């Protein structure tokens, strides 16, 4: 079993950092089996090809732009819904992710299961730190990442449970 939890986003553009902040919270607060990798992908694109290839489950946490939904709204997309979303995105890393997913499909290395946990940003202005609206979504989004892991039979162990 090979699972990757990938957080992507630009920490210099306010809410664009949500994906990175979600995986940071996961790594800080939970212990996962060795076959589950957590990766801060930042704004990387094709450089992630090797990391994303041949995964049993790829879970991506990211900010996703939507004109239909209010800032702070969480969206969960699965499998074929994910590449479709990235075909009309605005940020450079999402174009890169679309290319990576296309390349993985072309080479036969597409993940067996793909989950996107996305949060609609309120601001993409240059600034370090999330808006309160999006920061409030770290916890619910983290719960969705944990639920996606459970779907693949992974039970995350809270770090504080180890110290009790």
Curated annotation (Swiss-Prot):
Keyword presence, Isomerase: no
Molecular function terms, GO-annotated: aspartic-type endopeptidase activity; endopeptidase activity; enzyme activator activity; metal ion binding
Named cofactor requirement(s): Ni(2+)
Domain of life: Bacteria
One GO BP annotation of this record: protein processing
EC numbers: 3.4.23.-
Annotated transmembrane regions: none
Keyword vocabulary terms for this entry: Aspartyl protease, Hydrolase, Metal-binding, Nickel, Protease
Any Pfam family: HycI
Protein name, as recorded: Hydrogenase 2 maturation protease
Lineage: Bacteria, Pseudomonadati, Pseudomonadota, Gammaproteobacteria, Enterobacterales
Gene name of the encoded protein: hybD
